[in-house]
Amino acid sequence: MFCCLGYEWLSGGCKTWHSAWVINTLADHRHRGTDFGGSPWLLIITVFLRSYKFAISLCTSYLCVSFLKTIFPSQNGHDGSTDVQQRARRSNCRRQEGIKIVLEDIFTLWRQVETKVRAKIRKMKVTTKVNRHDKINGKRKTAKEHLRKLSMKEREHGEKERQVSEAEENGKLDMKEIHTYMEMFQRAQALRRRAEDYYRCKITPSARKPLCNRVRMAAVEHRHSSGLPYWPYLTAETLKNRMGHQPPPPTQQHSIIDNSLSLKTPSERLLYPLPPSADDNLKTPPECLLTPLPPSALPSADDNLKTPAECLLTPLPPSAPPSADDNLKTPPECVCSLPFHPQRMIISRN
């Protein structure tokens, strides 16, 4: 039919005897008479095709799609009911959400890759610029060398951090050990104090003070008799060697002046030989005590500070106005009444 129409349209709307003969010779079951009923339909179709070509193409595509849907069965296998459509809509929503999540992941990955690529491009640009500058100045620097230096710096930094952490751990262990030793020392000190308190409490107060006074007096007597300063480690030996032939120390009822005078050894007692003792080598021989010392070769700066021998026996003039220190000074008559000791004269000259 369309072939005939096209042929008639190409022939300018004029029928030929050949076309009429072809149409009339067709069988009735294949061609049931004229479809369009005459020539006016040809003009209508021609105008329609010229003006509504796009609409016809759309209708044709829609018909083709519907025809294909009727021929091929649907993949979902539903009959178009409301429940099936709702399930399909929900599945489509889930699928769209999954697609959206996948797209977001893809975009995130793309941004990360883009950032890395931009960093590499920037590093390459910097390296190129540095290489160009170093090439002008006679140097050369590559990206591998720069990365190697960066890795070396990172390793050095990590090594320093490791050393600092080890030093901190060692310091903590040392402080813990010192704290342990301090606790042990404090416990030992506490035990020592308890032992001292225990043995000190075993001596009664009535027996404790005379013993201390006896040792102290022996030490003072040793100092005055030997002319040496007081050394505590000589006190026990002197007390042991000289306890038999020395008089007992004075009682506490005497005054301080009487005690000091009684403890001093008289000059005539130095002439008699004493029993041998441990400190004989430290004492001055008796013949050396009476021998005058030779005069000094050169005058020294301390000559003005020494007291002459004749001034020792001269009474001091009384002070003009009485003061608060008069009671502390020695009266002139007491100075003259003191016995003469050649040993004191030798010491004063020295």
From Swiss-Prot:
Region (Disordered): 151-170
Signal sequence interval, chain numbering: none
InterPro entries membership: NPIP (IPR009443), NPIP_N (IPR054697)
Transmembrane segments: none
Pfam families: NPIP
Entry's family note: Belongs to the NPIP family.
Protein name: Nuclear pore complex-interacting protein family member A5
Source organism of this protein record: Homo sapiens (Human)
